[in-house]
Amino acid sequence: MMKILVCLPLLTLYAGCVYGIATGNPVSRLVTETLSLITAHRTLLIGNGTLRISIPDPQNHPLCIEEIFQGIETLKNQTAEENVVEKIFQNLSSLKGYITAKEKQCGGERRRVEQFLDYLEEFLRTINIEWNTEWTVES
């Protein structure tokens, strides 16, 4: 069961990547690049592990955008500036324009950066898959 839970997000990411590449959707490519950068530089983003960032309750809608961007801003302010990390924040800033129209405010408790990154990755996968059709139509 645990292997399925670990493999499911990877399968979702792969499906999103394949769709994004096949459709040539620039937003999908940006999401895919950002997910890859977060995965590659997760340890750097986590730092010493003491920072706490609000994560919406999993029972709420998965796209609690305001909290996500507040968390991103908190993480950005607490992360040492390096070119590769700055690219993550540039990508996330670029994506903000596409997703604020779907904004939903949610409440949540403060958790470790690692848990926030898990939530952020799931958030990016969700917008990559669920909204891809809408972005393709609007382009």
Swiss-Prot record:
GO terms under biological process: immune response
Keyword Acetylation: no
Key words of the record: Cytokine, Disulfide bond, Glycoprotein, Growth factor, Secreted, Signal
One Pfam family matching this protein: IL5
SUPFAM superfamilies noted in UniProt: 4-helical cytokines (SSF47266)
Positions glycosylated per UniProt: N48, N77, N91
Major location (coarse): secreted
Cellular location(s): Secreted
Any one GO MF annotation of this record: interleukin-5 receptor binding
Family designation: Belongs to the IL-5 family.
Protein name per its UniProtKB record: Interleukin-5
Species assigned in the record: Notamacropus eugenii
